[in-house]
Amino acid sequence: MAEAISKLAEQNGSQVGYTMGELMVASAAREIRDSEVVFVGMRLPLIAFVVAKRTHAPNAVGLFENGVIRTTPAAELIYTMADPPNILGATQCLDMLSVMSLLQSGRVHLGFLGAAEVDRYGNLNSTQVRGPKGLVRLPGSGGACDIASLAQRFVVSLDHDRQRLPERVSYITSPGNGDGKNWRQRVGLPRGGPSAVLRQKQFCVLMMMARLTSHRFIPA
């Protein structure tokens, strides 16, 4: 059934000149403001950065965790942040410590993150989830906890699934607004927090059209 809905959604999207994936990219691109410094990441946010640069945010600057800083998108498709096209033509090639220092100093405006779960307060879990056979270990934080803690704001991108949107995550890998109630200030995270989650939602209403929804989190 899910496959049938996805196929129908893609067909309906094509009738108006775009696919659901393209709509997700456009929505992510709109989160990038001109002249902002952005922790880009990979996959969907990487394409969103290119779209933003070519439309409304020509002065945005892209950061990558491996130390690459770009004021122009890579000239060719990249699969990892260390691929040669991402190095060629970079504004700077530093190291992880240097770009994380930019983050710590408050000079990173936006970061794009993914997770296995996100709750109503914007807390992210990418460490462990409970499956049919018990706990399942996941890859963990990477740089996500740093970005969630220290960027001026962050945006979450994930596929819509009820299990991935619990009331409260079972494990906080990367902090959003904790339990609310000025939590970030109380624990020493005076700036930042989640601003939006971008998700592709599938539902059945008449023609079962798929929609992109942008959910705003409960503030700190």
Regions found by a protein language model. Name each.
Residues 1-9, 76-220:
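Conserved phosphate- and dinucleotide-binding cores of soluble alpha/beta proteins
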Residues 6-89:
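N-terminal active-site beta-alpha-beta segment that forms phosphate/nucleotide-binding
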